[in-house]
Amino acid sequence: MADLALSPQRRTALTNLVRDESSFAAEYPRVADYWSTAGRLPGTGDDIADATFDLHLLHYMTGGASANPYWDIVATAVSPGPAERANRAEVNGGNPKGSARLAYAQIVLQAAYAYAIPSPATLRWVGDVAQGRPIFEVGAGRGYWAHQLTRIGVPTSAFDSHPPDRATNSAFPAAAGQTATWHPTATPPSTPADLVAAHADHALFLCWPPGWENPMASTTLAAYQEAGGSSLIYIGEARGGRTADSAFFDLLEQEWTLLDQDPGYVSWWNLGDRAQCWQRR
């Protein structure tokens, strides 16, 4: 587990923050709730690993400097998964079964940042498979991935039907002490065709598009290919999982070819998402 080098002043500030429960709850309610709850939940079985993870979460979610705070929090808990998950890199805290404590942290972090984990290696992979094209992301949520990609030099435009900085978004609820959007996120035009018309020469990025037969993924992909778009970067689960809809996977099977899949993609232990690049046939 990576050690977190904190100055004496920062350690004192964090100690004072957690001791002043009323101020903690007012300034960082989501973090305060996690902090008060985590100790009562079963951990991974490694108390030092759990405490290290919690300290990283506390530090980075209460103003600790970081270019990629989501990654800097979860990187402490990345370990190889079991053989049945192909020994993939995953956030499991050193326990293939994860823990209830880690599952609660997952809820907090996904709501604050993004559902998928943007490791530095996967960000570079996305930039590589984009092959110099700018990216447009539909369903960007808080724009965390768009922010990270732009930060490493991959021009990215972000769109979401409910940008969390100005609309209620149940997946990314507002909370004090939390960044509403990390990247300028526009509301898309009324139809997918209008949106993709200006971006057909971009790579389409769908990162955890809504599942349960919500048609967003399929209608966006259909409009994109109709406009002449040819490059899709998809981060999500396979057919029947928590992301995208059946019509989306039908389109992939009928009209698209899988070019690459990031072998180093880091997932949560309890999810089956992966990062893929598809090309129109």
Task: Identify what each model region corresponds to.
Residues 202-215:
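A short SAM/SAH-binding and catalytic strip from SAM-dependent methyltransferases
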Residues 135, 154-157:
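Hydrophobic anchor at the start of a short beta-strand
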Residues 132-141:
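Conserved class I S-adenosyl-L-methionine
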Residues 159-203:
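S-adenosyl-L-methionine
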Residues 212-280:
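C-terminal substrate-binding/active-site "lid" region of AdoMet-derived donor-dependent transferases
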Residues 113-131:
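A short, well-structured juxtamembrane/interface segment
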